[in-house]
Amino acid sequence: VSVTRPDLPPAPPAAVAEATSPYTRQQHGRAAFTLFQDAPSHDELHILKSAARATAKHMEASLSIPTATSQRQIPAKLLIENRALINAHLARTVGGKVSFTHLIGYALVEALCEMPDLNVRYTIEGGKPAVEHLAHIGFGLAIDVADAQGNHSLKVPVIHDADTLTFAEFVDAYQDLVARARTATLTTADFQGASVTLTNPGTLGTTTSVPRLMVGQGLIIGVGATDYPAEFRGVSPKRLAALGIGKTMFFSSTYDHRIIQGAASGRLLALVDAKLSGRDGFYERVFTSMHVPARPYAWEADYDYDPNHEKGKPARITELIHAYRSRGHLAADTDPLAYRVRRHPDLDLSS
């Protein structure tokens, strides 16, 4: 039975998206020649050179390490808000920005200082297995570098003696390595001495990963994307706030199982979680190092609020607004010659 009307013109052709597979495009139409001129038409063999060849050798050597991985999901709200406070201060003063990786990396350094038994490497001494306890932390930083042709390579330079640096010094050393990696001016010494590495595939949207552990290191930490849980991505911001849904991130700790056990790896991730949640004065130390004249936000548990029966919350918000209007100058940074944190109890959000 026909369901079309003969007196109507034929329907226009449906719009079909161009094929994305190079094979499909080469078999069906001109898209292969018009969209991707550099798409190969036959198999090609390229010899790995320089950094790519070194990476391949290190990856093959890493297969000799028996590894295991611990993972932990942590809330990112406090990290996001305190980073915004720091960057707002920097924008008003000396310029620059602090990244999530800066804060996470320094929290990891502090955690390893508190758990020195994890700052170790496996070695052979006199033909027998041994563990070397390192006096200082060699902090490896995985950097994705693109050349002029758009080819990407991985470089892992090292911040030497990271445990001896303040947060501000750590940020400067971090930025120096990144800048020299981008300009191909790193030296051989910059790649030696790592005891732990931090890799952040979360910048690409990766939720979690299990990175390879290189020979000579005890563990490698992976950081996932900072985002809302996938099941809530379609929810409006207002609804997310009403539900108390915040952004989270996954951490992974891949370690040499010959010298580090799973319980210790789990405690390390718990300690990093505690620091990024502000439970041991971590943000106070960071703010002091960066000369931020403000009190960092603190982690507080949420509570239910019924606007139909509880009238106290709007009144307290009004009082806080009035306090800032009338006494906000008491917390202002008005001394250009010295760093001083000014506080007033009426201006505290927790009040």
Task: Please describe what each predicted stretch is.
Residues 1-314, 327, 334:
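C-terminal catalytic/motor cores of large multi-domain enzyme assemblies
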